From Swiss-Prot:
UniProt-listed CDD domains: RuBisCO_large_I
Upper classification of the organism: Bacteria, Pseudomonadati, Pseudomonadota, Alphaproteobacteria, Hyphomicrobiales
Protein name: Ribulose bisphosphate carboxylase large chain
Subunit structure, interactors included: Heterohexadecamer of 8 large chains and 8 small chains.
Sites bearing N6-carboxylysine, chain numbering: 202
GO biological process: reductive pentose-phosphate cycle
InterPro entries reported for this sequence: RuBisCO, RuBisCo_large_chain_AS, RuBisCO_lsu_C, RuBisCO_lsu_C_sf, RuBisCO_lsu_fd_N, RuBisCO_lsu_N_sf, RuBisCO_lsuI
The protein's Enzyme Commission number: 4.1.1.39
Entry note: cofactor: Binds 1 Mg(2+) ion per subunit.
Gene: cbbL
Organism: Rhodopseudomonas palustris (strain BisA53)
Entry's Gene Ontology molecular function annotations: magnesium ion binding; monooxygenase activity; ribulose-bisphosphate carboxylase activity
Binding positions (Mg(2+)): 202, 204-205
Length: 485
């Protein structure tokens, strides 16, 4: 169906139930304005439901419609405020699924509010009965809207200047085990990892303030470790102090204490909510702190291919919200991450302008209006033996976090950190010399290991570790398998 079937005039406002496509929510001749917010949904209608009607219903229920005609529509600029589904395409190789392109007038959204944006776009509509499933695949955010957000508080360029580290990925590690350590032992892990050559250590998502270690105790021991490691190495170091708590008041208190102790970075979890994230981002900018976001909980709605919200959308929202770091996948690690899809995530974080790239799952051109760049973080099941693959897939503007790959080293934590640092330095040197480091990677690492016993032990310990599983979320226009490690 390529023509409009909208009912016009008085008949449009007769009491009763009317199909969404006849109420003005299906407008195939509509040309989106530069100022429109555009959303791409993957729509899976119930059996027997017209895909055009299902898509129009998504447009209606995410903007101005309800289940019946209401006369109060005539008191508004209804033609302007209705979301308009203007294109519906079958999803390649996915029978019964459709891509619905929906345009929203900018006036429907509050400036600078992810909470308001998400309340409309992913509000009630995801529970709509005529749909088997619904997924928000991508969004085009107009420049006029983007400029109402502050963007990353620090950004990649200023972070590198603050850390005095250039020309290579940054190295980190999540403290393990994530729960159960005392404050003193936790601080010892931080010191060993930083002294061994890492740039950062990190709290995990669920370490907050528990009986075995109060948050204040952790902060004190961690910052003591950071200061000692800086003195020993002559390098600037940091540890992501997780300020996530039950209330905003508690989070502000913890962030202020981290600042008083001299930390360069704090951390929050995605589960605190969009408004809390934006609030902490504003605090971080005001107080010159780097803000790390752990994407805890995201896979509950980003992983399934037919229902939920794509992580590329979450990445866009978080760049608007103003965090400086976000976990964005590893390609070769233990967590979900198709190579092409992950490339799309990284481009969203790091580029000033994103062209449409269907092969990476990016459906719209996106102008970031000079917002700072967001540093992606790769963590989860990576080790020194993958350094050539990580550098090739992810580039240099990334934090590579080797948690188990540092703390699980057979010679100890400091040796694990040294192994990762030497592997990275060897690979960067090979890259700068113009070598084909991706294909020569194993040879480069083996040569470096001849003069670095910790690296030799790491390569031997994890040489057979693979996470070769097919990804559940891949670009529909360029299906690719997960990378074999």
């Amino acid at each position: 169906m390529n023509e409009s079937v909208t009912v016009r005039g008085k008949d449009r406002y007769k009491s009763g139930v009317m199909e969404y496509k006849k109420m003005g929510y299906w407008e195939p001749d509509y040309e989106p304005k530069d100022t429109d917010v555009i959303a791409l949904f993957r729509v899976t209608p119930q059996d027997g439901v017209d895909p055009i009607e299902a898509s129009a219903a998504v447009a209606g229920e995410s903007s101005t419609a309800t289940w019946t005609v209401v006369w109060t529509d005539r008191l508004t600029a209804a033609e302007k405020y209705r979301a308009k589904c203007y294109r519906v395409d079958p999803v390649p190789n996915s029978p019964g699924q459709y891509f619905a392109y929906i345009a929203y007038d900018l006036d429907l959204f509050e400036n600078g509010s992810i909470a308001n944006l998400s309340a409309s776009i992913i509000g009630n509509v995801f529970g709509f009965k005529p749909l088997k499933a619904l997924r928000l695949e991508d969004m085009r955010l107009p420049v006029a809207y983007v400029k109402t957000f502050q963007g990353p508080a620090t950004g990649i360029v200023v972070e590198r200047e603050r850390m005095d580290k250039f020309g290579r990925p940054l190295l980190g590690a999540t403290v393990k085990p994530k729960l159960g350590l005392s404050g003193r032992n936790y601080g010892r892990v931080v010191y060993e990892a930083l002294k061994g050559g890492l740039d950062f250590t990190k709290d995990d998502e669920n370490i907050n303030s528990q009986p075995f270690m109060h948050w204040r105790e952790r902060f004190l021991y961690c910052m003591e470790a950071v200061n000692k490691a800086q003195a020993a190495s002559g390098e600037i170091k940091g540890t992501y102090l997780n300020v996530t708590a039950g209330t905003m008041e508690d989070m502000y208190e913890r962030a202020e204490f981290a600042k008083q102790l001299g930390s360069v970075i704090i951390m929050i979890d995605l589960v605190i909510g969009y408004t809390a994230i934006q609030s902490m981002a504003k605090w971080a900018r005001k107080n010159d702190m780097i803000l790390h976001l752990h994407r805890a909980g995201h896979s509950t709605y980003t992983r399934q291919r037919n229902h939920g919200v794509s992580f590329r959308v979450i990445a866009k929202w978080m760049r608007l919200a103003g965090v400086d770091h976000i976990h964005a996948g590893t390609v070769v690690g233990k967590l979900e991450g198709d190579p092409a899809t992950t490339r799309g995530y990284y481009d969203i974080c790091r580029e000033d302008h994103n062209p449409m790239a269907l092969e990476h799952g990016v459906f719209f051109e996106q102008n970031w209006a000079s917002l700072n760049k967001l540093m992606p973080v790769a963590s989860g099941g990576i080790h020194a033996g993958q350094m050539h693959q990580l550098l090739d897939h992810l580039g240099e503007d990334v934090v590579l976090q080797f948690g188990g790959g540092t703390i699980g080293h057979p010679m100890g934590i400091q040796a694990g950190a040294t192994a990762n640092r030497v592997a990275l330095e060897a690979m960067i040197l090979a890259r700068n010399e113009g070598r084909d480091y991706l294909h020569e990677g194993p040879e480069i690492l083996a040569k470096a290991a001849q003069t670095c016993t910790p690296l030799k032990a790491a390569l031997e310990t994890w040489k057979n570790v693979t996470f070769n599983y097919e990804s559940t979320d891949m670009p529909d226009y360029a299906p690719t398998p997960s990378v074999s490690v």
